[in-house]
Amino acid sequence: MPILLFLIDTSASMNQRSHLGTTYLDTAKGAVETFMKLRARDPASRGDRYMLVTFEEPPYAIKAGWKENHATFMNELKNLQAEGLTTLGQSLRTAFDLLNLNRLVTGIDNYGQGRNPFFLEPAIIITITDGSKLTTTSGVQDELHLPLNSPLPGSELTKEPFRWDQRLFALVLRLPGTMSVESEQLTGVPLDDSAITPMCEVTGGRSYSVCSPRMLNQCLESLVQKVQSGVVINFEKAGPDPPPAEEGQPDISRPFGSQPWHSCHKLIYVRPNPKTGVPIGHWPVPESFWPDQNSPTLPPRTSHPVVKFSCTDCEPMVIDKLPFDKYELEPSPLTQFILERKSPQTCWQVYVSNSAKYNELGHPFGYLKASTALTCVNLFVMPYNYPVLLPLLDDLFKVHKAKPTLKWRQSFESYLKTMPPYYLGPLKKAVRMMGAPNLIADSMEYGLSYSVISYLKKLSQQAKIESDRVIGSVGKKVVQETGIKVRSRSHGLSMAHRKGFQVLQGISEDVPHRLLDLNMKEYTGFQVALLNKDLKPQTFRNAYDIPRRNLLDHLTRMRSNLLKSTRKFLKGQDEDQVHSVPIAQMGNYQEYLKQVPSPLRELDPDQPRRLHTFGNPFKLDKKGMMIDEADEFVAGPQNKHKRPGEPSMQGIPKRRRCASPLLRGRRQSPAVNSHIGGKGPPAPMTQAQPGLIKPLPLHKEATNDSIVDDVVENHVADQLSSDMTPNAMDTEFLTSPPNLLEPSTNHTEALGHEHLGNNDLTVGGFLENHEEPRNKEQSAEENIPASSLNKGKKLMHCRSHEEVNTELKAQIMKEIRKPGRKYERIFTLLKHVQGSLQTRLIFLQNVIKEASRFKKRMLIEQLENFLDEIHRRANQINHINSN
């Protein structure tokens, strides 16, 4: 799981702009996002962990650490601001300490018991800076210095602040402020000459001098390829140079002196196991000291082990069933030199100085060997002093048949004395795998001394406490200073002791003599208060604080506040200013919703709710949806149990009058047509039809005025004319006879009754049912006075076809959603559809459409057959009438 730590320069110099118009900090943010996109192409990037550190003071510099997720990382990256100093050394130390936080707890470093390349936590630090001078509170620095004192326990066990699996890369932005006239050449990205370059090379990384956006993308692609699992090792040549590749031919081309391949500081790749995804190894790299059982502490180690190789050609040694570790070397001058020799059958042995008890160079623990195809160079890690051990083990199993003799045991014990004690554990596992489990006695001590073990345990506990403290401090904001500290002048005389001030004092008699005795030490704890930027000046308190061009505007505001006597507070902003919100705050609906009153309860909370089943394609659950409007967020929970097809009587606003222009000043024609058809004005109903499905009023105990208000549809009121006012409409309604209102107010029965008549819907009845309102109208006109007949028609038309059909549609939709194949009630309700033939056909088509949503095939088939029969009968009637 690679760790990718971005160290972003947030000094004030990052506010400079390139020729693209963007600041260096914006360029750095874009570079991080581009790197993440390029890295996401690799399937191995799923295990990446991203961290973010800035140039602020610790612990505020850590923006995203071990516990923060990807969303937090991106949010902190977006909110970075360039303000502060270029404290590169302190920030690098903070980054390294953050990476080393858990190493003592997990035991990755394995202090005193050899270095295990397969115990690693690969990390890459990518620093993005502008390469300016290093500035601190004490001044400007020319060289990069990392603080030596670290709060992390156990840091004294390693000489350097970094580890061998941590590499530092730097992107130094050198983008010019003006467009370059010269064309950019496609060459390699050069190293930068800033102070961070030597630090990068020490850790095994490098720096990039970025001079153009194209070069920046090239660097990011190179960095993505650098994300490899491995450790950095110093390879140094020990002894003379190797002889020429072909004997008898002198190597004329070889120059004298030190060569680049003599000392290389490169990475060895530690590949993870394809099955487990974790690297697997057997043998450590020896320590550079011989463990002393009497030593109370451990000597500090270098971050990168120094491995020396001998250029003497040797035969590679391998025996059956003895495990070994194989690591590929990163391309370097050393690998190039070995491959050019073209001798894959020979190898060079490797050593660690002072690893043996009496030998300064130590014994070999492996060898360097070119691959058979001469494509790479591999480091083979074997048991310590393997040229002695391997022949002994070979004789044990091939000659002695796993039954060691006394002479063999003496040779084996003498070998164990030359081997560091921490190799006993891996060696016991290896011989057990080979078939000799009792070869090494369990009583042999191969661990650390008691004092060292206690010391390491104590450091581990302290590191755990420090880790919890650092993790808990991540995300805390910098404490803002409440004022500016008053500091005494370090040089020069004070104002009161200057000669010019004394001359002025002699001229003027008003100057108090106390000024001569001023002592700045009395004001060491004083602070100058800062202005509150969020506090707006109350300019209406003083007319002279108002700019001249804003006098009329302020006068208008003050007049509006004065005239609004119902308000208990002064309103400092007008309506336009309330809606003048910065773009960055436009999407922040949470603060606005906190001030909105809670939504009203459901109209009928006792009504049973239909439970959603798993996999229901019609489920409208909006809990997980992102809402971009505050009003929708508030209004959403009220209607969450309604489908789009269901009418919501709760949201119908009240209307005062019927606004159909077709009803004004003219007698209704006998022909009956619906609003939907648009062919003519519909006839109002004055009496309820027998068996009519009556819509329920919203308020059962409301007055006549409120009943008419509730039942008027929204689209009716949109056609109001100026000659009909609400007061006039109310007067007309109140003066109308009571018997005119009874048919529309006595709607107390719901649509769920079963005594609605015959369930069979005939085509003839469907075609002729729309003529009934005219007969009802004629019978009603005989009993109603002529003075109020036109008024009643206007009112009852608003309560006629639209409301009845809406209620019928709601009931039919509920019946369609019910499981089963009992459709008699649907056809019964279809008998009572009001309006013209065209209105009824549209209504029937909507029912078929709703049935198709719920896959009611039998119902659809019956309704379509019924619809075809209607068209056929209608065509016959039209044909007869035309004849």
Swiss-Prot record:
A motif (Inhibitory loop) lies at residues 625-632. This is Integrator complex subunit 6. One of its GO terms (cellular component) is nucleoplasm. InterPro entries: INT_SG_DDX_CT_C, Integrator_subunit6, VWF_A, vWFA_dom_sf. Component of the Integrator complex, composed of core subunits INTS1, INTS2, INTS3, INTS4, INTS5, INTS6, INTS7, INTS8, INTS9/RC74, INTS10, INTS11/CPSF3L, INTS12, INTS13, INTS14 and INTS15. The core complex associates with protein phosphatase 2A subunits PPP2CA and PPP2R1A, to form the Integrator-PP2A (INTAC) complex. Residues 666-686 are annotated as: Disordered. The inhibitory loop acts as a regulator of protein phosphatase 2A (PP2A) activity: Asp-628 and Glu-629 residues mimic phosphoserine and phosphothreonine residues and bind to the PP2A catalytic subunit PPP2CA active site to block substrate-binding. Transmembrane segments: none annotated. Residues 3-227 form the VWFA domain. It holds the Pfam family INT_SG_DDX_CT_C. The keyword Nucleus applies. Component of the integrator complex, a multiprotein complex that terminates RNA polymerase II (Pol II) transcription in the promoter-proximal region of genes. Belongs to the Integrator subunit 6 family. GO terms for molecular function: protein-macromolecule adaptor activity. Gene3D superfamilies: von Willebrand factor, type A domain (3.40.50.410). GO terms for biological process: protein localization to chromatin; RNA polymerase II transcription initiation surveillance; snRNA processing. It comes from Mus musculus (Mouse). The modification Phosphoserine is found at S800. Keywords: Chromosome, Nucleus, Phosphoprotein. It is found in: Nucleus; Chromosome. PANTHER family: DEAD/H BOX POLYPEPTIDE 26/DICE1-RELATED, INTEGRATOR COMPLEX SUBUNIT 6.
